[in-house]
Amino acid sequence: MKHCLALHAGLLLGTSLLAPVTLAEVALFAADGYRQTQYRSPTPAALEGARTLDTAALQRLLHEQPHTRLIDVYRRTWLNGRFIEDEAHANLPGSLWLANTGDGQLEPRWQRYFETHLRNISQGDPDWPLVFYCRSDCWLSWNATRRAYHLGYRQLYWYRDGIDAWEQAGLPLVPAQPAELPGAFLTPNAAP
């Protein structure tokens, strides 16, 4: 019995000593403010530097400003220098899929990929309307919109409920493939 109590006390002490390490490892936000874990969880109603859109507002925007660019930031597995189609993905018609650019901390290649594609689709104009989205309750689009804001883009929109809301409204989705990650970006210090 004494041994059982000692073992139990030892386990409790060991668990309590490990708890702070575990909690520190799963911090929701990085020091620079980007969400870095639990990406599929409730998101805030607003985001600094961007206007939050529902489906009706997005449809109006696309009608009033047809040059608006839609940017899907849903993840896609990257392995051995290429995207792996582990599941079919569909997105809003006319979208550019910039996979893996909504993570909290981007490796340099993904940052270059993001910046280069934004510069290209906006024709270098920081006032070009850009709409970021993912799925509902997805922090990836929140991070990507915030990242674009910090890059100096000024006409930003966050389609908070994303693909799920579009589909629930009975609107069409199209099969999608992520934009290519240029081979030069695979080199750690390559310029865009």
Give the location of each predicted region:
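A polyampholytic, Gly/Pro-enriched intrinsically disordered region
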Residues: Y113-G124, P175-T187
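Solvent-exposed loop/turn segments at secondary-structure junctions
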Residues: R75-L79, G102-G104, S136-L140, G162-W166, ...
